């Protein structure tokens, strides 16, 4: 069976020469929910930006849906992998919510009633009533609403893999709980970069720790996230639900 996402010996350095990723190797199985955790500056966001081709590897190989990621396969990769940015302001740029959510599928050729139904379905999936939100101006929304609109825009593309960068950051408790429920319901393969280790424990069966651009641990979440020494060695703390 083809694994939806494979990364082998991925290296990447910033333009100033700073090494951001140093030999990252990982693979995600179909339908798997995986948390990606690590301290600030560990390379999490840089890795995610590689997974739908916003950054291309310095060295190493990425396969998306069985196809090597390269300049010639970017269109396929960006349909296959939906990326949610940490800051929704980086993702919302159209005048209204409806236009933001429609942007992706419209560029894939959807139009008319099929496009409208796609937008309505995506908004409903993230708990936003189309009648209330379609004509809302994105810049007037709360941070939680903006994050949900951004996620609706990703879901409207119907990707096979969801790559989410700090999806719970800035959310109030009710919005966070709604997000957790949604993550457990969505059928896609998911890679979730987060500092919210309680959310990781609740939504992801597997956890990968990266530090200084390298994978330092990879295993079942209930083992990785209960290992106080391992977590503290890499600038993390036990989830609150496990006690500190």
UniProtKB/Swiss-Prot annotation:
Membrane topology: Peripheral membrane protein
Record has Disulfide bond as a keyword: no
GO molecular function, one term: ATPase-coupled transmembrane transporter activity
Superkingdom of this protein's organism: Bacteria
GO CC field: ATP-binding cassette (ABC) transporter complex
Classification via InterPro entries: AAA+_ATPase, ABC_transporter-like_ATP-bd, ABC_transpr_CbiO/EcfA_su, ECF_ABC_transporter_ATP-bd, P-loop_NTPase
Function field: Probably part of an ABC transporter complex. Responsible for energy coupling to the transport system.
Name of the protein this chain belongs to: Putative ABC transporter ATP-binding protein gll0289
Originating species: Gloeobacter violaceus (strain ATCC 29082 / PCC 7421)
Upper taxonomic lineage: Bacteria, Bacillati, Cyanobacteriota, Cyanophyceae, Gloeobacterales
